[in-house]
């Protein structure tokens, strides 16, 4: 098994605490609402949202795969940090054991925030991660962030 790691950073004008509430704590409800072209539904399979929770994320018709199952590994409300692993569906299967993701939202001096994402692809055998998988993951993250950001800018009273 190999581990391929890559990091993404994206800036937002939304304050860190507010973005954490919307993007992380209520993303299950918000993503299908603000980005239905990316996520059609999120179903809680097991758990209460904390570590060990299993979620099924379904994708719209025409997406490369129908669903993924995520396991929540950590929710740190103080440091605006969230970790989860993709354990089933999507790209996980013959060549990937799992994908571990850590998201940290850091406040910036101007009142906005930086979304820092660290992704670790755990491959099976000597398989390598394809550039298309990384590109698709980056695009999904950017789509969701911008959709949530637009929603929060349009709804100044939400998630305060």
From Swiss-Prot:
One of its GO terms (cellular component) is nucleus. GO terms for biological process: abscisic acid-activated signaling pathway; defense response. The keyword Cytoplasm applies. One of its GO terms (molecular function) is signaling receptor activity. It is found in: Cytoplasm. Brassinolide binds at residues 55, 82, 84, 101. Its main location: cytoplasm. InterPro entries: Bet_v_I/MLP, Bet_v_I_allergen, Plant_def-hormone_signal, START-like_dom_sf. The keyword Cytoplasm applies. Keywords: Allergen, Cytoplasm, Pathogenesis-related protein, Plant defense. SMART domains: Bet_v_1. Belongs to the BetVI family. May be a general steroid carrier protein. This is Major pollen allergen Bet v 1-F/I. It comes from Betula pendula. The gene is BETV1F.
